[in-house]
């Protein structure tokens, strides 16, 4: 089941959420860094029957052409040729030539459409997906490290529930409608399965694992002159190198296993090659996640929670005399460094470390951003990547930094906690009185807070069940002030997920360092790139499902079509709101979250106090479920005073006119009599000024006897009237809060 082209939209005060319901379970989702030739963003997600590739945005495919039948009744063409098929001959190969419209499908302020989807059926569930750690770019600029195949092919790796690991290549251009409607695909249910080459795809099977892999990573092999080759044929082959990738996968075999494969991208469509691993590492404990360095392609970041974060280099031999391998890499790599997280808090001295949820490379592979299970995040500066580092002298192992604190903890350059994670890091307080009495305790806000702290206290056993992740997206140079900037998405999953976004990592890192040094930087009222922003009201798009993943989608570009129709990046796209969109992974839904254009981006203090109210000028009625009431209209004025006051300009409530019509559209000056047989009207007498405030009481009994006017009742908007009354209450409450803030309370003790 593919994504529906039009998602279900939900708006909140902070963001807009577009929900795609798939109807089947989703195991993993990734954003491919290269755009398609027509400017679409490519998404890949795994499900119980394989993987699905989605092209989102860019220029639309042209509608399929109607099939014309050139055969005429009663005539016989002179040039008719009879073709006798034989079993040895095969039919002509279908060549797909998709055609696209000239204008892009994304207009300013609209939702990017789903241009095309393609299901790659593998007959088993795809649990994990890995893409190349390259910066986002257009198709014509995708020659990363000299790999020209990336200009025309999608290259990614998947792990399956049947212990198989595949490297898949696929054309970067989406298939046309004619290609998906070919008659040969209707002959069998298995005709369109992956591996047969009907979509131009190639599969390479990586053998070796005997259990399902828990993670996978992929990177390019950097071409270099090697002295390890022992034959002239191998040296001649290196003159015209073939693009190769290295795939790493870890599993729970034995106590933990890490395997690496060297895969050449030379398979032909319709064939499945098999590759054996060139390195196998047996570990003391299973790994949680792995990722390759985007610059130093041979370095692999491994997370062994809760012990440490370690860096493995498969190209550096563990022993200098290791020359038994005939390939370009040694038979055994080396472990370069181990980074240790802090210890968990508890009522007594704890010897358990905080579980490591995730860790990712940042600053072009020179630093590591990590997230712990109690909501703490930290940055390890390995190579002087700090924005305030002078000449690279303030890295983790410089003279000014010992690297290890107490020989057991690796010091963070900067650290903090995610918003909303205080119940995870506060240890439970054992109260002897409450534990021994056993009396019933009513649920109050204070006891509810204690219950949350008890359920999610900072004990290592309870923190081990916390799941989350980190996604780092490199930003194009046109979206930020400098080249090489990055955005990060940190999340802790669950029924009420915590998802935070760092718009620009370098500016956020710099502001944190200045704050730690007492530089006077106000993180609450600073510019948006210097703060960590938490996405709120995510349950509106997930519709009750648990959040199992979050990835970043770089905002590529908006509608500047060049001469060849390829979308180019807009310099102003990064100046409004976040430079990325967040893709949330539910159990059976995908939710794309982006910041509203009218969302307040000023100081957080003014937003919390309600001192600034944004007007929704471009609000239009949509056929969607919204998470807030419609646009507010001017409230109706009411006179709540008992005594009549002269009208004063600038007052909050204007006095009510006495000659206005009543609720039943009749004049108040003449009130019908309630006596039977008396059809004359009784003139309304003026009451004394002291009783004018209670004149409505005489109208209530008379109004109750009158029949209801159904036409007027249908025209009334009762909901709007209730909202007007609520608006009055809010205004009075804000006035009361403003008066309370300016009042100081002084207590005197009796001597």
UniProtKB/Swiss-Prot annotation:
Among the GO biological process terms of this entry, one is:
protein transport
Q: Which domain of life is it from?
A: Eukaryota
Q: Where is this region: Disordered?
A: 57-77, 419-443, 671-692
For bias type Basic and acidic residues, the affected ranges are 68-77
Q: Provide a GO CC annotation, any one.
A: nuclear pore
* InterPro entries xrefs: WD40/YVTN_repeat-like_dom_sf, WD40_repeat_dom_sf
Keyword annotations for this protein, in alphabetical order, are: Coiled coil, mRNA transport, Nuclear pore complex, Nucleus, Protein transport, Repeat, Translocation, Transport, WD repeat
**Where does each WD repeat begin and end?**
21-65, 162-209, 237-271, 282-322, 351-390, 455-492, 494-534
Q: Where is the composition biased (Polar residues)?
A: 423-438, 683-692
User: Subcellular localization, per the record?
Assistant: Nucleus, Nuclear pore complex
* Xref: PROSITE patterns: WD_REPEATS_1
User: In this entry, which stretches build a coiled coil?
Assistant: 716-750
Subunit details:
The nuclear pore complex (NPC) constitutes the exclusive means of nucleocytoplasmic transport. NPCs allow the passive diffusion of ions and small molecules and the active, nuclear transport receptor-mediated bidirectional transport of macromolecules such as proteins, RNAs, ribonucleoparticles (RNPs), and ribosomal subunits across the nuclear envelope.
Q: What is this protein called?
A: Nucleoporin NUP37
Q: Which organism is it from?
A: Chaetomium thermophilum (strain DSM 1495 / CBS 144.50 / IMI 039719)
């Amino acid at each position: 089941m593919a994504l529906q082209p039009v998602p279900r939209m939900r708006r909140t005060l902070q963001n807009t959420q577009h929900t795609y319901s798939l109807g089947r379970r989703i195991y993993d989702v990734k954003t491919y860094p290269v755009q398609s030739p027509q400017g679409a963003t490519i998404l890949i997600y795994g499900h119980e029957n394989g993987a699905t590739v989605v092209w989102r945005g860019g220029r639309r495919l042209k509608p399929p052409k109607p099939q014309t039948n050139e055969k005429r009744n009663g005539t016989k063409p002179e040039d008719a040729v009879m073709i006798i098929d034989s079993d040895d001959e095969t039919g002509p190969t279908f060549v797909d030539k998709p055609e696209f419209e000239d204008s892009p499908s994304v207009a300013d302020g609209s939702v990017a459409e789903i241009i095309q989807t393609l299901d790659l059926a593998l007959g088993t569930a795809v649990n994990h997906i890995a893409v190349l750690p390259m910066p986002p770019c257009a198709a014509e600029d995708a020659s990363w490290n000299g790999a020209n195949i990336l200009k025309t092919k999608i290259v990614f790796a998947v792990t399956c529930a049947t212990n198989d690991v595949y490297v898949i290549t696929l054309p970067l251009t989406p298939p046309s409608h004619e290609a998906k409607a070919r008659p040969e695909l209707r002959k069998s249910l298995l005709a369109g399965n992956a591996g047969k080459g009907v979509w131009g795809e190639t599969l390479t099977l990586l053998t070796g694992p005997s259990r399902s892999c828990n993670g996978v990573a992929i990177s390019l092999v950097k071409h270099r002159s090697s002295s390890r080759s022992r034959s002239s044929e191998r040296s001649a082959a290196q003159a015209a190198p073939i693009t190769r990738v290295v795939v790493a996968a870890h599993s729970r075999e034995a106590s933990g296993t890490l395997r690496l494969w060297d895969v050449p991208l030379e398979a032909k469509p319709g064939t499945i090659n098999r590759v054996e691993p060139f390195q196998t590492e047996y570990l003391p404990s299973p790994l949680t996640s792995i990722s390759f360095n985007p610059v130093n392609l041979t370095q692999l970041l491994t997370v062994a929670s809760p012990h440490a974060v370690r860096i493995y280099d498969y190209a550096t031999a563990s022993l200098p005399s290791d020359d038994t391998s005939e390939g370009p890499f040694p038979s055994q790599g080396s472990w370069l460094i181990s980074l240790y997280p802090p210890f968990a808090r508890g009522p007594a001295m704890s010897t358990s470390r905080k579980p490591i949820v995730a860790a990712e490379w940042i600053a072009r592979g020179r630093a590591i951003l990590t997230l712990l299970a109690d909501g703490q995040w930290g940055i390890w500066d390995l190579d002087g990547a700090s924005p305030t580092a002078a000449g690279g002298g303030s890295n983790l192992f410089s003279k000014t930094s010992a690297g290890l604190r107490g020989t057991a903890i690796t010091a963070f350059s900067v650290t903090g906690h995610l918003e909303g994670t205080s119940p995870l890091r506060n240890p439970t307080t054992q109260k002897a009185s409450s534990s021994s009495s056993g009396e019933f305790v009513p649920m109050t806000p204070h006891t509810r807070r204690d219950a949350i702290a008890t359920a999610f206290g900072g004990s290592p056993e309870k923190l081990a069940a916390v799941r989350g992740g980190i996604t780092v997206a490199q930003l194009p140079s046109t979206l930020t002030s400098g080249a090489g900037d990055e955005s990060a998405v940190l999340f802790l999953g669950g029924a009420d997920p915590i998802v935070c976004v760092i718009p620009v990592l370098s500016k956020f890192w710099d502001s944190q360092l200045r704050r730690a040094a007492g530089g006077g930087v106000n993180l609450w009222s600073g510019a948006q790139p210097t703060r960590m922003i938490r996405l709120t009201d995510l349950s509106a798009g997930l519709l009750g499902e648990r959040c199992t993943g979050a990835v970043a989608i770089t905002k590529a570009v908006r509608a500047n079509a060049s001469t060849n129709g390829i979308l180019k990046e807009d310099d102003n796209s990064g100046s409004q709101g976040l430079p990325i969109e967040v893709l949330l992974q539910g159990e059976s839904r995908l939710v794309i979250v982006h910041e509203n254009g009218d969302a307040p981006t000023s100081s957080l203090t003014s937003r919390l106090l309600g001192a600034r109210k944004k007007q929704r000028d471009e609000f239009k009625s949509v056929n969607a479920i919204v998470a807030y009431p419609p646009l507010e209209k001017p409230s109706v004025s009411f006179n709540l005073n008992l005594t009549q006051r002269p009208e004063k300009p600038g007052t909050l409530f204007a006095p009510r006119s006495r000659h206005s019509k009543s609720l039943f559209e009749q004049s108040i000056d003449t009130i019908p009599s309630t006596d039977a047989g008396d059809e004359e009207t009784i003139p309304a007498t003026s009451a004394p000024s002291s009783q004018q405030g209670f004149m409505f009481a005489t109208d209530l009994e008379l109004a109750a006897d009158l029949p209801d006017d159904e036409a007027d009742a249908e025209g009334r908007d009762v909901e709007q009237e209730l909202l007007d009354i609520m608006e009055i209450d809010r205004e009075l409450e804000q006035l009361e809060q403003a008066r309370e803030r300016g009042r100081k309370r002084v207590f005197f003790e009796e001597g």
